[in-house]
Amino acid sequence: VIPFVASVAAEMQHVYCAASRKC
């Protein structure tokens, strides 16, 4: 099983972190 959901969730979190600059 490919952890597609986990991969997408991690990418979305990274984008949100970069956009909000709350890293």
Swiss-Prot record:
Disulfide bonds: C17-C23
A single BP term in Gene Ontology: defense response to bacterium
Assigned protein family: Belongs to the frog skin active peptide (FSAP) family. Brevinin subfamily.
Native organism taxonomy: Eukaryota, Metazoa, Chordata, Craniata, Vertebrata
Tagged with keyword Phosphoprotein: no
Summary of the tissues where the protein is detected: Expressed by the skin glands.
Protein name: Brevinin-1Eb
UniProt subcellular location: Secreted
Keywords: Amphibian defense peptide, Antibiotic, Antimicrobial, Cytolysis, Disulfide bond, Hemolysis, Secreted
Role summary: Shows antibacterial activity against representative Gram-negative and Gram-positive bacterial species, and a very high hemolytic activity.
Signal peptide from the UniProt entry: none
A single cellular component GO annotation: extracellular region
Domain of life: Eukaryota
